[in-house]
Amino acid sequence: MLMPKRTKFRKMHKGRNRGLANVGNKISFGEFGLKAMERGRMTSRQIEAARRVMTRKVKRGAKIWIRVFPDKPITNKPLEVRMGKGKGSVEYWVAQVQPGRVLYEMQGVDEVVAREAFELAAAKLPFKTQFVTRTVM
């Protein structure tokens, strides 16, 4: 699963996930992409599950790029523990996603196969997504 090798601080404030994606909102590597239409959090498990289902669909033909990285730690306190006594331990890592962010890119397959693979991947994700193609200038 994806997670940072090391961070400056172990735990992070919750923060707010506002605004639109102004970085990573264009296709830069492949021909086709999967773009987020809503904001949300994408866990490292969800990123990996979507990657695996896409890889299985396209077999060996395609190159897939993952354009998001889970760099935010989410903490949790154990069950039946009283309030206080500090922040809980890190349970999992998430990537915060804004609308317009390209999540995955693909190259080396035809559009029909890419669209089917991205539909399977979108079923694993917690927000609405859209299939996009690279515009040729």
UniProtKB/Swiss-Prot annotation:
GO terms for biological process: translation. CDD domains: Ribosomal_L16_L10e (cd01433). InterPro entries: Ribosomal_uL16, Ribosomal_uL16_bact-type, Ribosomal_uL16_CS, Ribosomal_uL16_dom, Ribosomal_uL16_sf. GO terms for cellular component: cytosolic large ribosomal subunit. PROSITE patterns: RIBOSOMAL_L16_1, RIBOSOMAL_L16_2. SUPFAM superfamilies: Ribosomal protein L16p/L10e. Keywords: Ribonucleoprotein, Ribosomal protein, RNA-binding, rRNA-binding, tRNA-binding. The keyword tRNA-binding applies. It comes from the Bacteria. Gene3D superfamilies: Ribosomal protein L10e/L16. Part of the 50S ribosomal subunit. Belongs to the universal ribosomal protein uL16 family. This is Large ribosomal subunit protein uL16.
